[in-house]
Amino acid sequence: MSIQTIRLSALALAATMVAACYQVPQSTAASGQAGEIFASDQAAGSVIVVDKIGMPSTGWLVVHAVQNGEPDLSGAIGHAYVSAGPSSNLSVPLTTALPAGSEAVVMLHLDTGNAKVFEFANGAVEVLDGPVLRDGKPVMQKIALR
């Protein structure tokens, strides 16, 4: 079993534990349902712009890299704090610019640890700010960078 598989298994376990404690509201927000994300393919660079989200509570809009066609959920390459409810035209600064031809995943995360402190460290066993789940799956969208 590879270290990547172990990390993904740990993330899945953490997401399940978060889901057991927190249910995404099913009510419809003004610009979409809570626990939704809409992002378009965009120009490569050091910022990702997300068209709109519906966030069930305050939390994080997170960018994960894509490796070999799969999201690399072992860490984040960018994050921005977001308020509960609908938001649009959100910018997420990246720690490393992504080149043209690459892909990224934008994902909603809860703020369940220390308020306004992103606690989703690379390789962490305990994930405090885990993903928002809708129907048992992380709320995320893959985008291409051109």
Regions found by a protein language model. Give the residues of each.
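C-terminal partner/receptor-binding element of secreted or periplasmic proteins
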Residues: 120-146
